Regions:
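N-terminal secretory signal peptides and thylakoid transit peptides that target proteins
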Residues: 1-20
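Hinge/lid segment of periplasmic solute-binding proteins
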Residues: 36-42, 109-162, 186, 213, ...
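Conserved C-terminal helix/tail region of periplasmic/extracytoplasmic solute-binding proteins
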Residues: 42-43, 69, 78-79, 118, ...
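Extracytoplasmic "Venus flytrap"/periplasmic binding protein-like
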Residues: 66-137, 146, 168-180, 268, ...
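Extracytoplasmic/periplasmic substrate-binding proteins
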Residues: 112-115, 212-216, 243-334
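Long, aromatic- and glycine/proline-rich binding clefts that accommodate carbohydrate-like moieties
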Residues: 140, 300-302, 350-408, 413, ...
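Extracytoplasmic/periplasmic solute-binding protein
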Residues: 148-156, 161, 186-232, 274
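Glycine-centered hinge/linker elements that transmit conformational signals in sensory
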Residues: 188-195, 229-258, 303
């Protein structure tokens, strides 16, 4: 897929609306032709209900709703969209799957589909068609979307995390560029605190930011929850080293981070209370849209590499699940394929300035990643990530460990001094073992 210009992306987003110039007859013909080209056709009389998480970036919701309306216009299938808080999507999805009633499509997190794979619509044909059209899936996306060789969900992308910092404060701290390793990160954090601009990283049960940076912290030092055979492997010198690093890092933090959820670091950064955090592009988006003076000073950098010597990152992967109880499985496939197709996906990424990083390789050429250099660090988040089940396989156990915030809690306990690093990792291993015995 060649690189598209921003003008071309905007034209894609216009879609069938450009047919308005043809008059009502021409518009009807254009709509019918576009619908005929859709590879997955809905059932006659289908109607859908979709549940998704509440947006952090307004452009995401605006273009999503337009794409839904466009689908309805093309197919005649009405779609009701419900929005839930990030923390509430997971339990609501689990209840719906288990009672066999609820939304036809649920957009959930990480490996949620692996908790109830047999209660989902087989999406293999949809995934294979999208992969052929758009350069293939990144390895992490394939890992999350498949189980035993079958696609059980369609990765929508990942709300990528990067280091978000104030460029002027970085220089005041004596750094010309953001450190590329964890040792340099600790030096920077100490310097920022000394200058009155402390860092702040979420250590509460935050679905996104808390999970993302604590898994990176563990993995970047060589730690892991389980080995390749899904056997608990938390207790190790590498895990202890990661928790000792967390303790030193925490000493530089602004007070209160152990209770922070996904919105807290955004608010603290925009208020000028912290000079560094791990976050999505939403902070920059809010500053730009709000015309805040700090927008020009906000910078982004990829998460530093730790002692393992290579990127070991987790990002907030979100997946579209077709629920097996749906009366309209063909319409479910049709809508999901439609939303993932370039005519809808690329303009949606543009509108949200890259809040979601693509799971399909061809979409890396979207000009949203290069039109503003501050967007670029988020472009490769899915390419750089591994699954939260590392180093084992995804499944019920990995999903439950994630839902129970085992890694976040372990890091928070060791960092804050509630437990020693040894005590924290031993407690975490017991929790991991409980799930992996099932």
């Amino acid at each position: 897929m060649r690189k598209l210009s921003r003008r071309e992306v905007i034209k894609l987003g216009a879609g069938v609306t450009t047919g308005a110039a043809l008059g009502s007859a021409g518009m009807s013909f254009a709509t019918s032709a576009a619908a005929a080209e859709m590879p997955f056709k809905p059932e006659p009389g289908a109607r859908l209900r979709l549940l998704r998480w509440k947006r952090f970036v307004q452009g995401d919701e605006d273009l999503f709703e337009k794409n839904i309306a466009k689908f309805t216009k093309l197919t005649g299938v009405p779609v009701r969209v419900d929005h839930e808080s990030w923390e509430d999507v997971r339990p609501k999805a689990a209840v719906a799957a288990n009672i066999g009633s609820g939304p036809d499509i649920i957009i959930a997190w990480y490996d949620d589909p692996h908790q109830y794979p047999d209660k989902l619509i087989d999406m293999t044909d949809v995934a294979e068609d999208l992969g052929k059209r758009y350069g293939g899936w990144y390895p992490a996306a394939r890992t999350y979307g498949t189980r035993n060789g079958r696609w059980i969900s369609i990765p929508w992308g990942a709300a990528g995390n990067a280091m978000v910092y104030r460029g002027s404060w970085l220089k005041e701290a004596g750094f010309e560029r953001f450190p590329e390793d964890t040792a340099g990160l600790l030096k920077l954090c100490r310097a920022l605190k000394k200058n009155g601009h402390p860092p702040g990283f979420a250590l509460g049960n935050a679905v996104g930011d808390g999970n993302v940076w604590t898994h990176w912290l563990l993995w970047s030092h060589g730690g892991k929850l389980v080995d390749e055979n899904n056997q608990p492997a938390v207790v190790s010198p590498e895990t202890e080293a990661s928790l000792e690093f967390a303790r030193q890092l925490y000493e530089t933090f602004i007070p209160g981070t152990t209770s922070w959820l996904d919105a807290n670091n955004n608010k603290a950064f925009l208020a000028g209370k912290i000079g560094l955090t791990a976050n999505g592009i939403s902070v920059y988006y809010a500053a730009k849209k709000g015309k805040l003076p700090i927008a020009s000073d906000i910078q982004h950098a990829n998460l530093p590499v730790g002692p393992v010597g290579r990127p070991m990152e987790l990002h907030l992967l979100t997946q579209m699940m077709g629920m097996g109880y749906s009366k309209y499985p063909k319409a479910v496939k049709s809508l999901i394929h439609f939303l993932m197709s370039k005519e809808q996906y690329l303009p949606w990424q543009q509108a949200s300035i890259g809040y979601i990083t693509q799971p399909l390789k061809a979409y890396a050429s979207n000009p949203v990643w290069t039109e503003d250099p501050k967007h670029t660090p988020y472009r490769d988040c899915v390419a750089r990530m591994v699954s939260n089940g590392y180093a084992g396989a995804l499944g019920y156990a990995s999903a439950q460990v994630m839902a129970d915030y085992v890694v976040v809690n372990m890091v928070a306990e060791a960092a804050s001094g509630t437990l020693t690093p040894k005590e924290a990792m031993k407690r975490a291993e017991k929790r991991v073992a409980r799930y992996y015995r099932i």
